[in-house]
C-alpha cells in the first residue's frame, strides 16, 4: 500500500465559537488535531508513480479541476468541490415535506441549510427529515448499507407513519446546526481523511464570512483520486 505524505495541518474551523465550556462549537473532535508530516493513505491501489505530482510534472497534466491556475503540487478542496451554483440547498424555513420532495427528485441524501445571505447555518439529511434513528433501533451505522431483509417491511411501514407526522415541521427543527466545515484552501488530503475514515459523507465549504461556496463529498474525493491517478499515469 502506497501512501501520500502531507505536511499541512488541518484547516477545519467551526462555523461559530462559544466561550461556554460545554458548547459543541468550542472544541473539534480529537482526530482533527493532526500534527504536520503524518501519513495519510489515499488509496489502496494508489501506485507510487501516481503520487500527487510536483509543480513541474503537473504543468503538462490535463487533470480537470475547478481551477485554471498553474498547479502548485498540492491539491485543495476548492479544486474538486461541487460549487454552490450546482448545489441544492434549503433554508431553515423550508418545510420537511418540501425538502423530502427535493431529495427524491434529485436523488440526493442531504442539504446544506443556509440563510438569506448564503451563510451556512446547518446540514440536514434524509435521516434527520424522517427521524429514522427513532425506528432503526441503535441508530444509523455507515457500515450497514442495506437493512436486514426481515426488517424491511416493518421499516417501510414505520416510514409511512413518520411521513404522516411531518405536516408543519420545518428543516430548522431537525437540522444539525454549526456542522464541521472546511475552506477552499484546505488541503484535499485532510478533507479526504475525514470523509473516508469517519461517518461524515459531506463537508460544507465556506469562505471567511461563513458563507457557503461549495461542498466536498466522498464522491468528489473518489473522483479526484481517479483523476490524479490518470494524470500520474500519463506523466509516468
UniProtKB/Swiss-Prot annotation:
Residues 47-66 are annotated as: Disordered. GO terms for cellular component: chloroplast. GO terms for biological process: cell redox homeostasis. The keyword Chloroplast applies. Residues 81-142, 175-231 form the CBS domain. It comes from the Eukaryota. Residues 1-53 form a transit peptide. Keywords: Acetylation, CBS domain, Chloroplast, Plastid, Repeat, Transit peptide. Pfam families: CBS. This is CBS domain-containing protein CBSX1, chloroplastic. It comes from Arabidopsis thaliana.
Amino acid at each position: 500500500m502506497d501512501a501520500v505524505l502531507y505536511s499541512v495541518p488541518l484547516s477545519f474551523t467551526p462555523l461559530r465559537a462559544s466561550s461556554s465550556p460545554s458548547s459543541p462549537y468550542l472544541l473539534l473532535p480529537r482526530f482533527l488535531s493532526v500534527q504536520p508530516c503524518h501519513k495519510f493513505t489515499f488509496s489502496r491501489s494508489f501506485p507510487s508513480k501516481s503520487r500527487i505530482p510536483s509543480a513541474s510534472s503537473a504543468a503538462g497534466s490535463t487533470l480537470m479541476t475547478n481551477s485554471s491556475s498553474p498547479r502548485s503540487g498540492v491539491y485543495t478542496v476548492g479544486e474538486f468541490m461541487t460549487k454552490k451554483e450546482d448545489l441544492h440547498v434549503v433554508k431553515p424555513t423550508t418545510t420537511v415535506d418540501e425538502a423530502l420532495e427535493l431529495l427524491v427528485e434529485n436523488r440526493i441524501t442531504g442539504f446544506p441549510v443556509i440563510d438569506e445571505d448564503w451563510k451556512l447555518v446547518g446540514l440536514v439529511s434524509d435521516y434527520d427529515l424522517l427521524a429514522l434513528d427513532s425506528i432503526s433501533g441503535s441508530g444509523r451505522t455507515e457500515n450497514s448499507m442495506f437493512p436486514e431483509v426481515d426488517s424491511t417491511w416493518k421499516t417501510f411501514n414505520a416510514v409511512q407513519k413518520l411521513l404522516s407526522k411531518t405536516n408543519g415541521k420545518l428543516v430548522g427543527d431537525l437540522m444539525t446546526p454549526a456542522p464541521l466545515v472546511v475552506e477552499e484552501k484546505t488541503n484535499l488530503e485532510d478533507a479526504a481523511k475525514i470523509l473516508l475514515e469517519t461517518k461524515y459523507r459531506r463537508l460544507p465549504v465556506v469562505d471567511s464570512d461563513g458563507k457557503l461556496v461549495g461542498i466536498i463529498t466522498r464522491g468528489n474525493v473518489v473522483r479526484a483520486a481517479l483523476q490524479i491517478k490518470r494524470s500520474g499515469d500519463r506523466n509516468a
